[in-house]
């Protein structure tokens, strides 16, 4: 392959740089097993740790793994080395939407098609509790047929039911007024605003809000101070006006755009895609169950799956640290009692440090509060199914193994 040198990551030959950010480079990759191209996002682990962005990287991986939609970039696998994290993704050959725009407006039919694909993808995310929060042309890619693909979920959020998000993020020209006000906000409404800015840019060739100084730019956004150039139709103006409403409570929703807007609906065919089979049943079980303070979400299920366990992504190999996960067909409270019983059986004491998390130590050193031998956390999957995550931070491996065996035997005996 002329495009590729001798550098390889796993089964992938690594070629030229096709994208670059603050903490990562995206390289063109070649899968030697099937002859296909991929995009390999290579993240500098040390730099991410230095900036405290571990959770953001994990969030991007988990989000991309969860979502399965033709207008969202797909993730294939994650490869970790001592210094790098490599996310192997679908290769989108057409480049960024921002390159296609280049201060030049699109034909109405092309703009509508891309906007429909954007809305369809974002609506798919929102229906699964995922909010992008940084939608902009630089994060929208085009494939060889001109179809749109949403990428870069590093700022995405999955809040608890009814929660308001509070982290300010996004790019200045595309952020919603409520982000500028630095108040709690709805991730759904923020994404809708960004979609409106993108639609304006598709039709005009430039964004509605732009200025060299941030204070002036923010004032324009807060007042929704923009002017339509010649050529915009009444239907286009009405839709953009309803989207770029500074009040998130009265701003049009995605459902209203899809169902009610006449301009949007021209030639629109919604895409219905399901979650991947490996997690579909788990997510369905979650949606049917009642919520709790420690209720597991789909992202945690993915993180616990054998093909995408991110728990050690930023940890150096250390023979003194161990982690085990055991399933329990009990309520969370009953599972805590099982943990206490298993610990007692092997002469360990249990101290609750959170509602569903305990510290486990040999009884004779209980007074030494700085000595943490084991910890066990109960994560509720459904009201009668839990996952117990057991971690060893210090002490003898023998005691850790004895406790795990004791708990496993206790839980196995009750279902046999």
Curated annotation (Swiss-Prot):
Assigned keywords, A-Z: ATP-binding, Kinase, Manganese, Nucleotide-binding, Phosphoprotein, Serine/threonine-protein kinase, Transferase
Region (Activation loop): 152-178
GO molecular function: ATP binding; protein serine kinase activity; protein serine/threonine kinase activity
Residues binding ATP, per UniProt: 18-26, 41
Cellular component GO terms, alphabetical: cytosol; plant-type vacuole membrane
Catalytic activity: L-seryl-[protein] + ATP = O-phospho-L-seryl-[protein] + ADP + H(+); L-threonyl-[protein] + ATP = O-phospho-L-threonyl-[protein] + ADP + H(+)
PTM annotation (Phosphoserine): residues: 156
Residue intervals of the NAF domain: 291-315
Cofactor(s) required for function per UniProt: Mn(2+)
Pfam families assigned to the protein according to its UniProt record, in alphabetical order: NAF, Pkinase
Domains: entry comment: The activation loop within the kinase domain is the target of phosphorylation/activation by upstream protein kinases. The PPI motif mediates the interaction with the ABI (abscisic acid-insensitive) phosphatases.
PANTHER family: CALCIUM/CALMODULIN-DEPENDENT PROTEIN KINASE KINASE-RELATED, CBL-INTERACTING PROTEIN KINASE 21
Protein name: CBL-interacting serine/threonine-protein kinase 21
């Amino acid at each position: 392959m002329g495009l590729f040198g001798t550098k390889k990551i796993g089964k992938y030959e690594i070629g030229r740089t096709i994208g670059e950010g603050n903490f990562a480079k995206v390289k063109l990759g070649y899968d030697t097993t099937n002859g296909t191209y991929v995009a390999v996002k290579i993240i500098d682990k040390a730099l991410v740790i230095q900036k405290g962005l571990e959770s953001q990287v994990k969030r991007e991986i988990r989000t991309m793994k969860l979502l399965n939609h033709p207008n969202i970039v797909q993730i294939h696998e994650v490869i970790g080395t001592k210094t790098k994290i490599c996310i192997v993704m679908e290769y989108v050959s057409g480049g960024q939407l921002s390159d296609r725009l280049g201060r030049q407006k699109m034909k109405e039919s092309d703009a509508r098609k891309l906007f429909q694909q954007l809305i369809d993808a974002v609506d798919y995310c929102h229906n699964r509790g995922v909010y992008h929060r940084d939608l902009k042309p630089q994060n929208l890619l085009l494939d060889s047929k001109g179809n749109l693909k949403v990428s870069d979920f590093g700022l995405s959020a999955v809040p608890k039911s009814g929660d308001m998000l509070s982290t300010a993020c996004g790019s200045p020209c595309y952020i919603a007024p409520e982000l500028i006000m630095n108040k709690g906000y709805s991730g759904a409404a923020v994404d809708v605003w960004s979609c409106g800015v993108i639609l304006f840019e598709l039709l005009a060739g430039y964004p509605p809000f732009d200025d060299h100084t941030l204070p002036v730019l923010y004032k324009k956004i807060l007042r929704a101070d923009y002017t339509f150039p010649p050529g915009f139709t009444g239907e286009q103006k009405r839709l953009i006006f309803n989207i770029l409403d500074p009040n998130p409570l009265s701003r049009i929703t995605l459902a209203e755009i899809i169902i009610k807007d006449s301009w949007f609906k021209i030639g629109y065919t919604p895409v219905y895609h399901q979650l991947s089979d490996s997690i579909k049943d788990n997510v369905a079980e979650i949606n049917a169950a009642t919520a709790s303070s420690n209720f597991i979400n789909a992202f945690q299920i993915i993180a616990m799956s054998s093909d995408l366990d991110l728990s050690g992504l930023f940890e150096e190999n250390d023979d003194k640290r161990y982690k085990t996960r055991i399933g329990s067909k009990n309520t969370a409270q009953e599972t805590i009692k099982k943990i206490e019983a298993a610990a007692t059986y092997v002469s360990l004491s249990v101290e609750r440090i959170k509602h569903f998390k305990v510290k486990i130590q040999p009884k004779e050193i209980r007074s030494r509060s700085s000595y943490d031998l084991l910890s066990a956390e109960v994560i509720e999957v459904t009201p009668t199914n839990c996952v117990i995550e057991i971690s060893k931070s210090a002490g003898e491996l023998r005691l850790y193994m004895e406790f795990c065996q004791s708990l496993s035997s206790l839980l196995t005996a009750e279902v046999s």
